[in-house]
Amino acid sequence: MAKNNAVAGFNALNGVELNLFTTDELKAIHYATMEVLMDPGIQVSDPEARQIFKENGCEVNEKTNVVKIPEYLVRKALQLAPSRFVLWGRDKKFNTVQECGGKVHWTCFGTGVKVCKYQDGKYVTVDSVEKDIADIAKLCDWAENIDYFSLPVSARDIAGQGAQDVHETLTPLANTAKHFHHIDPVGENVEYYRDIVKAYYGGDEEEARKKPIFSMLLCPTSPLELSVNACQVIIKGARFGIPVNVLSMAMSGGSSPVYLAGTLVTHNAEVLSGIVLAQLTVPGAKVWYGSSTTTFDLKKGTAPVGSPELGLISAAVAKLAQFYGLPSYVAGSOSDAKVPDDQAGHEKTMTTLLPALAGANTIYGAGMLELGMTFSMEQLVIDNDIFSMVKKAMQGIPVSEETLAVESIQKVGIGNNFLALKQTRQLVDYPSNPMLLDRHMFGDWAAAGSKDLATVAHEKVEDVLKNHQVTPIDADIFKDMQAIVDKADKAFRGM
């Protein structure tokens, strides 16, 4: 079912590939999903969305708000949805291509409500505030393996005082030149977000549409519901040319079947229903196939994200997206640890590597702790190192006449070493080279202060926040952007 311009299962960045399903198994998931979209269907709470579905041939029950979506509409939507689109940054060097069968990218986690702060070997977890968003954005602007910025935490100091979500739009744009992905948008305020971007482009609405420097994420309500907010984010995103991420957060054993294959069916139905709505609204609307689906721990009553199941589900979703010819955005680099510790390192590596090898286009989760509730800047810079190692693993072992190196082996001969070879010196950067992870012997490590990884990461965070320079927004333009936020605040307060 992949489009002709997409190569299912291929990832341009990796030489090692993880295949979870046969073509027949992918078809089985698809056909099971088509059954579910007709029976029981999807509950659509938004009247405007129901009308769009109805006008395009869906059966709509206005008493129950249930919409039944036939397979031919799904197939039509999948043909219309682009396999490739660009996430624009304020600085074009940060432009990021999202393409089915393209490169793997990473972004930070969102959206938590707390931050874990590290000082003198101690951890303190506190409510997140707007300044935390600014600091994390600056950190992501620096981090070479974070390709764009997703809203990491809530500005809880603004909650109830102003238009929080609108503040959460401008603050990231001001503190990173990378693309901004708004993970917590409010449907009724999308016009404000659009106007902020329009102001950035000097009032040029067409430029804002062609080069959107932000995008949005919405979540269906599992099982099988599209809320008013979700529908309005989809509809307005399509109309304004804003890329939209339809991301299911199903919990296997809770809001979806305990069998992971069954969970993929409900997940697929939820995501496809949103993608169909986007394409019925504006054919060709830019959409991701998204996932933060995991399992429900029936013994502890939690939804763990540092589990092998999350990694497997995210890898599976990447394969489903490739089957449909769509860019994917999946959870990974996830951890249930409360602080940046051994558990975090293990869980993050596992849940990153699986979807990366499956060819997910974006893996989000950098900096996340405590089942998605907490964000750590120290963990973010550690994750930046983990991603560089995963990238190296993804390259595999290239085999060619050059890399087989027969002439070099013959030249060096028996019992000698390869250190003096010109080839070795030229490829000094060929091996993996982490920034923070320590590879010294004990004596050198002790002489440098015997610092553990969290301490080294904290020092790097302080250095970046003090010294890294973000490409600024022109002062007059920023004033116009701020005026939109002020307008939203006045509307929130009823002024």
Swiss-Prot record:
GO biological processes: methanogenesis; methylation
Keywords: Methanogenesis, Methyltransferase, Pyrrolysine, Transferase
Keyword Transferase part of the UniProt annotation: yes
Top-level division of the source organism's lineage: Archaea
A GO molecular-function descriptor: trimethylamine methyltransferase activity
Catalytic EC class: transferase
Induction (UniProt): Induced by growth on trimethylamine but not methanol or monomethylamine. Part of the mtbC-mttB-mttC and mtbC-mttB-mttC-mttP-mtbB1 operons.
Catalysis performed (reactions): Co(I)-[trimethylamine-specific corrinoid protein] + trimethylamine + H(+) = methyl-Co(III)-[trimethylamine-specific corrinoid protein] + dimethylamine
Pathway annotation from the record: One-carbon metabolism; methanogenesis from trimethylamine
EC number per UniProt: 2.1.1.250
Keyword Methyltransferase recorded: yes
Summary of subunit composition and partner proteins: Can form a complex with MttC.
The protein's role, per its UniProt record: Catalyzes the transfer of a methyl group from trimethylamine to the corrinoid cofactor of MttC.
Similarity comment: Belongs to the trimethylamine methyltransferase family.
Protein name, as recorded: Trimethylamine methyltransferase MttB
Lineage, broadest ranks: Archaea, Methanobacteriati, Methanobacteriota, Stenosarchaea group, Methanomicrobia
Gene that specifies this protein: mttB
